[in-house]
Amino acid sequence: MAHAECSLLSEADFVMTTDRSVFYISDGTAITAEVLGHAVLSQFPVNITSLTLPFVENVQRALAVKAQINALYQQSGVRPLVFFSIVTPEVRDIIVQSDGFCQDIVQALVAPLQQELGLSPAPVAHRTHGLDASNLGKYDARIAAIDYTLAHDDGISLRGLEDAQVILLGVSRCGKTPTSLYLAMQFGIRAANYPFIADDMDNLKLPPALRAHQNKLFGLTIDPERLAAIRQERAENTRYASMRQCRLEVGEVEALFRTHQIRYLNSTNYSVEEIATKILDIMGLTRRMY
């Protein structure tokens, strides 16, 4: 990735260290800078301390950010890494003149794309995550998905399951709620979820309301050791968090999934983002960009 020109530094200014400070800067939400910057940094064995600075839209704000970057460099002797996306030239130039190692994450891709498309870019601040007449319908659909998911979290309601696009099943604390919310917020997916609790284990059955939507069911499971560790943080030294109880619940629920031929995924070693993406792929759900 090509980097923007920052202030000139001598060879003595380059310090090899795996501990680096990172700035994510934008004239919008800074989500794009965070996502792309994190994706690049994940390729390196570095320990980062990050600061996100959204809505750097004017000269005064840019000067304050530049001073912050320079002060950190003077204090640590190590150049901060700066991932930025700023449309206004005079604001952008101030950041570029800082003592950070500057990466204009969008511009690095714009030039080759301009050549391929045969078009000149027309940058507009807030276009990526902003709201206007062109995407209002998509925004409303995403909010509706979030509302639906919250109303059908943790088995709160089994009504309206015909409107669900996926129904997640699993024991308590296996990742159903965060995955459901991520599906709704990131992809506009209406996701319900239903927990199997300790009291269900003596006679574990699939509720009729769920059997009626067999094609929408997807199970999450988890290693008992990981489940016990998570539960210990919430309810230390209880039956709920014991290894014996965790093994029992996971075993019973996995058997239920197999009996009813419900597709399922072990969430132990996956992030919420990875779990959600795998569910979309396995269930054949269309992912939407917002």
From Swiss-Prot:
The molecular function terms in GO held by this entry are:
ADP binding; ATP binding; phosphotransferase activity, phosphate group as acceptor; protein serine/threonine kinase activity
Q: Which InterPro entries match?
A: Kinase-pyrophosphorylase, PSRP
Q: Which domain of life is it from?
A: Bacteria
| EC number in record | 2.7.11.33, 2.7.4.28
Keyword vocabulary terms for this entry: Kinase, Nucleotide-binding, Serine/threonine-protein kinase, Transferase
Q: Name one Pfam family in it.
A: Kinase-PPPase
Give the disulfide map. none
- Which positions are annotated as binding ADP? G170, V171, S172, R173, C174, G175, K176, T177
Report which reactions are catalysed by this protein.
[pyruvate, water dikinase] + ADP = [pyruvate, water dikinase]-phosphate + AMP + H(+); [pyruvate, water dikinase]-phosphate + phosphate + H(+) = [pyruvate, water dikinase] + diphosphate
Family membership noted in the UniProt record: Belongs to the pyruvate, phosphate/water dikinase regulatory protein family. PSRP subfamily.
Q: What does this protein do?
A: Bifunctional serine/threonine kinase and phosphorylase involved in the regulation of the phosphoenolpyruvate synthase (PEPS) by catalyzing its phosphorylation/dephosphorylation.
Can you say what this protein is called? Putative phosphoenolpyruvate synthase regulatory protein
Instruction: Write down the species.
Output: Enterobacter agglomerans
